Amino acid sequence: MSATATTTVVEPPTTTLTGATEPPFTAYTTSQGLRVSPVPLPEHNTDVGFGALIENVDLNNLSDEQFEDIRKALFEHQVVCFPNQHNLPPETQYAITHRFDPESSTYGHGNRTNQQNNSILHPDLHTLPGVPQVQLIGHGVVKDHYGLEEVRLKHPHHRTFHRDPISEEEEKEKQVTRFYRWHIDAALYDYNPPVVTTLLAVNAPQGTQTLRYDDKSGHEMPVPLGSTAFASGYRMYELLTDEEKKVAARTRVQYFPHAYVTINKARALPNGLGMYSEGLELDKSELPPWEESRVKTFPLLWKNPVTGKLALQTHGCCAEKILIDNEDGTTTVIDDLPKVREILYNYQRPGINPERVYCHDWKNGDFVIFHNRGVTHCITGAYRDDQTRIFHQCNLAASHPPAGPSEEDIAAM
C-alpha cells in the first residue's frame, strides 16, 4: 500500500456547551410493570436523544412478556441500563443476550480473537470457561473468578493505538484522557455484527477525568472514570444533508479480511474515530488464511427492526472499500484507502460532538444492553496499577446481516 502522510478531514466547528435539553421521552410503566425512564444526563448533553433506565424486573426470572417489553424499549432507546444487578451470573447474561437472536450461539468474534496474537483485540479479552460466550474484561489482577484461577487484565489505553498520545504528565497530573477507538462490536470477517452487546459492571472504580478530542475542534468534556461512550447512528444519519442521505442509502462498506490484524501496526486519529493512512496496514499476504467468500460487506445505513429508522453504522478504522450502487445500475468502487477513511470520518464526526455523546457512569451492578446496530461506542479512561475493574461482556455473532434501506426508503428520499 502506498504511504500517505495523513487523512484529510473536515474539521468540525467549535461548539459552545449549554444546559441540558428536556429528556427525550417521558418515563412510563409497561404492561408488565417495568419502569422505563430517561438516563440522567450532564449539562453538556444537549442533543442526546437516547438511553433509558429499566427497573422493577427480575432478570434471573424473566418472562417472555417482560422480555418483549425490554426488547421494544431497547430498539426505541438504544442503550438500556438495569441498576443493582449484583447477582446476575454469566449464564443469565448469556441467556438474555441470546434471546435477542435465538439462532445465534457463537461469541461475536468467534472465540478466536485470543488466538491471534497480532490482533489489536488480543490483550483485552478472556473467555469465562463455563460460559465461553461471555468475556472477562477490565483492569488489574482478578483471582478465582468463575473458573479463572488468576488473570491480569489491562484496560485498553489510547497510547497503544493513537499515533500522537497525550503525555504521561498531562494524563497523571491533569487527569486528561481520550476516546480510545470508536467502533461497533463486530468481527467484520466471516461473522455478522451482533444485534446487541451486554455489559455487567462487577467492579467499577469511581472518579472523573477530562476527555479531550485533540482534533482542532477545541472539544473536551468531563467523563466518569472508565466510562463507555455511546453515539447514535440515527443522529449521525439525521445530520447528513439531503444529498448525502441519498448517496448513503445506496452505499455499502467492504471491510478488510481479519481487519483487527490488518490495522495492528497502523495508528488512530486523536479522537479515536478513524485512522492515519501511512501505509502501515498489513498486506493481505501477511494475514492469517482468509477466503474472499468470507469477506464482509454491509450497508452504510442499518434499519431498526421496530421503529424503521435508519442508522449510519460503520467501523471506519476497519473499512477497506466503499461501493456506491448508482441509479443507472452501475457501481462506483472507491478503493483509495485515504479517501475511504475521509468519507466515513466526515459522515460520522458531527455525531460525536460532546453534546451528542452519552458517557455511561458505571456503578457496581449496572447491567447495560446496547443496540449494536444502532449506536457506535468507545472505551475511555486510564486506570492506575492499584485499581481493579471487572466487567462481563457478551455479544453473539448474528444469525443474519443488518438490513439496509428498502426500495421504498430510497424512493422517499
From Swiss-Prot:
- Annotated GO CC locations: cytosol; nucleus
Q: Where does 2-oxoglutarate bind?
A: 228, 362, 389
Which residues of this UniProt protein bind Fe cation? 183, 185, 377
Q: Which UniProt keywords apply?
A: Cytoplasm, Dioxygenase, Iron, Metal-binding, Oxidoreductase
Ranges annotated as biased composition (Low complexity): 1-18
Q: How is the cofactor bound?
A: Binds 1 Fe(2+) ion per subunit.
Question: EC annotation?
Answer: 1.14.11.48
GO biological process, alphabetically ordered: xanthine catabolic process
List the InterPro entries: TauD-like_sf (IPR042098), TauD/TfdA-like (IPR003819), TfdA_dioxygenase (IPR051178)
| GO molecular function list | alpha-ketoglutarate-dependent xanthine dioxygenase activity; iron ion binding
What follows loss of this gene? Leads to cells defective for the utilization of hypoxanthine or xanthine as nitrogen sources, while being still able to utilize uric acid or allantoic acid.
Q: Which reaction does it catalyse?
A: xanthine + 2-oxoglutarate + O2 = urate + succinate + CO2
> Where is this protein chiefly located?
cytoplasm
Q: Where does it localize?
A: Cytoplasm, Cytosol
Segments of this protein annotated with the region Disordered: 1-24
Cite the Pfam families for this sequence. Answer: TauD (PF02668)
Required cofactors, per record? Fe(2+)
Family, according to the entry, reads as follows:
Belongs to the TfdA dioxygenase family.
Role, per record: Alpha-ketoglutarate-dependent xanthine dioxygenase is a non-heme mononuclear Fe(2+) enzyme that decarboxylates alpha-ketoglutarate to succinate and CO(2) while hydroxylating xanthine to generate uric acid. Allows xanthine utilization as a nitrogen source.
Protein name in UniProt: Alpha-ketoglutarate-dependent xanthine dioxygenase xan1
Naturally occurring in which organism (per UniProt): Schizosaccharomyces pombe (strain 972 / ATCC 24843)
Taxonomy, top ranks, is: Eukaryota, Fungi, Dikarya, Ascomycota, Taphrinomycotina
